[in-house]
Amino acid sequence: DKSLLRKYESISYDVDEIYQDTKNLLQLEAVACKDWLTNKVDRCVGGKVAKQQCAGSLQLPLNDVGVMALDFQGKSGIATSIGHAVASALIDERAGSKNAIAEALTNIIWAPLKEGLQSVSLSANWMWPCRNEGEDARLYNAVEAVSDFSIALGINVPTGKDSLSMKQKYADEEVIAPGTVIISAAGECSDIKKVVEPVFQLVENNSIYYIDFSEDEFHLGGSSFAQIRNGIGENTPSINDAAYFKKCFNAVQELINKDLLLAGHDISAGGMLTTLLEMCFAENNLGADIHLDGFDEKDPTKILFSEKSGIIIQTAKGIEVDEILTSHDIS
């Protein structure tokens, strides 16, 4: 096979339309509430479901990680999560692979893992339209990126599956599916009672932190925002430094183990704005006052809608949190 260079146009938008863009964004299936799916199934069958989909007083399906207890009396469990970055992979298949892993990890991060990041094992489910020009080369690059990124993080990918005939033929045309990898993550949870939920808590003197895991720019390519603007985007964010990502992950694990977090949520579909909104949705009479002055990026649209890997945390112990983040060289 041969490599093909595919270029997509950058996203055009008007900052003054941010409120309408938000309304449109929240109606996308990838972003909108999933209660149509979760509310029709038993979410606690067997009695060992320690953390199911729903959170908060309003029981909205917002939790990033699922946790099953190992027995009825102990505090150990198994944490699971998934991640994907389909549109991101259209722009850059290597970035798409790393973003899929990053999403799975920033989902499972809210459960205290016995050995931190080293506790995690991944499964890769490949869905790709092979035997079409350029796609075999893209698949090779994507698989190599998963391998390299996982090795750099010190985690394994012992299993997976593939569907490599993702093309539908008609009488006069063909439609190929976008090459996609779905990453599943699993690890041993050391204390099922310490799992952090994405629901802001009404306490005095609390602080909200944004932690950037990617060290990339606030690109809009491959985002849900790009979709509502009828585009894909020219550039997609990636993970620039696996070592820094690993430091961020283990720092958050330390915060969880020391009971320093009130709430936490990853940034994925919909970007930072969706993350902040979701953390307010699950309780009555709850809101947040957010200032974007501390960002080097001055375009609020990019800050709020970019889906580069990162998390939002809430704490009432800012001094202790600052000390731990500083000790891990996280700014």
Question: Predicted segment positions?
Answer:
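Glycine/proline-enriched, intrinsically flexible loops and inter-domain linkers
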Residues: D1-S331
